[in-house]
Regions:
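Active-site-proximal helix/loop segments of hydrolytic enzymes
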Residues: 1-147
Length: 147
């Protein structure tokens, strides 16, 4: 039981993370870009590396906020090859706020009041990360959308 936060990586943090990603990716076929010229490949790799670092930073941020706001055990920040995170062109994370296989958590998750707590904690995590995200955009000399 507890909260886990994942960010994309080709290699999973551990065996359990790898198994979770395999199970969650079942039936999904990722779209891979056609062969790129060397310059585009290098630019894509540079962009991916920056996004990967920022996703790790975002995952740590989410993990800390959620475990504190929801008063839950933190199970850590983990890496795994989740297809749902593959095409993100910005920092992206996958958060598990509980486990339906755990009776206590399952009944908590079913309660409307706890669902609201989860939504508020996620909202707090997102909004409190925005200044850092904007700072990262400036560092990369990119503009915030609609500014």
């Amino acid at each position: 039981f507890g909260i886990e936060t994942y960010f994309l990586s080709q290699h999973a943090s551990n065996k359990q993370s790898a198994q979770t990603a395999l199970r969650e990716n079942e039936g999904i076929t990722p779209l891979f870009p056609q062969q790129q010229n060397p310059v585009d490949f290098i630019l894509n790799q540079m962009s991916h590396n920056a996004s990967h670092r920022q996703s790790q930073e975002l995952a740590i941020h989410f993990q800390n906020i959620l475990k504190n706001k929801l008063n839950k055990r933190g199970r850590g920040v983990l890496q795994a090859p989740f297809v749902v995170l593959l095409e993100a062109e910005m920092p992206a994370v996958l958060v598990e706020v509980g486990f339906l296989s755990n009776r206590k958590e399952c009944s908590e998750i079913a309660e409307r009041s706890y669902q609201k707590q989860i939504a508020q904690a996620l909202s707090t995590a997102i909004l409190s990360y925005l200044p850092q995200f904007k700072k990262n955009l400036k560092k990369a000399k990119l503009r915030w959308p609609r500014e």
